[in-house]
Regions:
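Short, surface-exposed secondary-structure boundary micro-motifs
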Residues: 63-65, 81, 134, 227
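Short, compositionally biased
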Residues: 86-100, 149-150
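Aromatic- and Gly/Pro-rich amphipathic surface segment
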Residues: 5-50
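Flexible, gly/ser-rich surface segments that form the specificity/activation loops bordering the active-site cleft
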Residues: 79-85
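Mid-domain Rossmann-like dinucleotide-binding core that forms the NAD(H)/NADP(H) cofactor-binding site
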Residues: 75, 101-178
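Glycine-rich cofactor phosphate-binding loops and adjacent beta1-alpha1 units
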Residues: 163, 168-229
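A glycine-/small-residue-rich N-terminal strand-loop-strand element
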Residues: 37-79
Length: 229
């Protein structure tokens, strides 16, 4: 979502730089449809609102003819955007059990993103992992790692996020200027390094990846769940 918001605030030139393949399409369209038609089409596309969000819960009000096992009136969780009414493919929906509240089911897709990062990291009982970025997905990643018997370190520039993670058992470090997070991680692992790093932060540079790699032991696992150049 942060990337979408940042993209939306960019001017046309910066948007073009971020989508070089689309620029080629624009050039081809100019040769076939002319400049004015192309300009109007591009402007319409770039100024079209994009719904945010990717995790919701709601009641089914209509189903397609080929949909199976989901019917009108069912309560489902999906990866659709935040809106009053949405259309979602069946393979991106799941029935919500009766004993699960809407407030709990709303975490389904977000938690699955965190869980996918953990699945790729293949943590083992007693291993130490560092989570870079303690936003919603980062915090869920920490909790899931703790539930698997891992030691969890968390880093984030926001002190409130660090305090929240610390409240359920994560060793945290508020990062900023002159903060050596690599030595901090090495000191907590007796200079061995962490067994793995999961990056759930959105960054404009490769710094989170580079620092996470330095904090890992030899043959440690590095998983990028967030975004980095």
């Amino acid at each position: 979502e942060g990337m979408l918001i940042s993209f939306g605030k960019s001017n046309y030139i910066n948007k073009a730089k971020q989508q070089p393949n689309k620029v080629k399409d624009v050039i081809n369209k100019i040769s076939t449809d002319g400049i004015l038609e192309t300009v109007n089409a591009v402007r319409s596309k770039l100024e079209k609102p994009i719904p945010l969000g990717y995790s919701n819960v709601g009641e089914v009000i209509k189903v397609g003819s080929s949909v199976k096992d989901i019917k009108v009136g069912d309560r489902v969780a999906s990866n659709g955007p935040h809106a009053e009414m949405i259309a979602v493919n069946q393979n991106l929906c799941i029935l919500v059990p009766n004993n699960v509240k809407d407030e709990e089911a709303a975490f389904t897709v977000i938690a699955s993103i965190a869980l996918q990062g953990i699945r790729l990291a293949k943590p083992d009982f007693g291993e130490t992992f560092i989570v870079s970025g303690l936003g919603l997905i980062g915090l869920l990643t920490c909790k899931l790692l703790l539930s698997q018997g891992c030691n969890v370190l968390g880093i984030d520039p926001d002190s409130e996020r660090c305090d929240l993670a610390k409240s359920f058992g994560v060793k945290t470090l508020k990062i900023g200027n002159n903060v050596d997070q690599v030595n901090w991680a090495l000191n907590l692992t007796k200079n061995v390094g962490v067994d793995g790093a999961i990056i759930t932060a959105t960054a404009k540079s490769n710094e989170p990846i580079n620092l996470a790699a330095k904090a890992c032991r030899k043959r440690g696992r590095l998983i990028l769940v967030g975004s980095s150049p």
